Structures are given as C-alpha cells and as structure tokens.
Amino acid sequence: MAQAQSPLQWLATTVIRGYQLFISPLMGPRCRFNPTCSHYAIEAIKLHGTAKGSWFALKRILRCHPLHPGGSDPVPPKNDRCNK
C-alpha cells in the first residue's frame, strides 16, 4: 500500500511537476542523467521525505552541467536503521 504524502511533499512534487509540464518543454532536453533531474527529485522526495529528498535533488542538479559526463544515477535507497 502506498504511503500518503505529507502536505510539504505534495507541494514540492506539484511544483516540480509544474516545471515538467510548463517550463521544461520550452527549454528542450538538457539533462545529462537518467532519470532526468526533475524525475529524480520527485522520486527522492517521495522516498526520503521533503528535506532529505530535496537535498539529494539539489546535489544532483549541481552535478548536471556540461563538464559532468552524466549517465545513470538512480536515487539512493532508503537506509532502514531498524533492520541493522
């Protein structure tokens, strides 16, 4: 069963989705990574929460520039400290 999003997660993913629908098509494909930075951000926020997911997304966006080779860069898995 899917976990419900917090209001902050909903807001963050809605803003990113708005970017995907309205701004990104005007700029064309520019992301060097797979998945794209915006998809990565949504996945990271849903998996890790708003604060940590946004931190992962920011670090990823800062790596997305012409001097970086890009490639496959999935969201890191969530560490479950209770199972260690």
Curated annotation (Swiss-Prot):
Transmembrane segments: none annotated. GO terms for cellular component: plasma membrane. InterPro entries: Membr_insert_effic_factor_YidD (IPR002696). Keywords: Cell inner membrane, Cell membrane, Membrane. It is a peripheral membrane protein. Signal peptide: none annotated. It is found in: Cell inner membrane. It holds the Pfam family YidD. It comes from the Bacteria. Could be involved in insertion of integral membrane proteins into the membrane. Belongs to the UPF0161 family. This is Putative membrane protein insertion efficiency factor. It comes from Shewanella denitrificans (strain OS217 / ATCC BAA-1090 / DSM 15013). The lineage of its organism: Bacteria, Pseudomonadati, Pseudomonadota, Gammaproteobacteria, Alteromonadales.
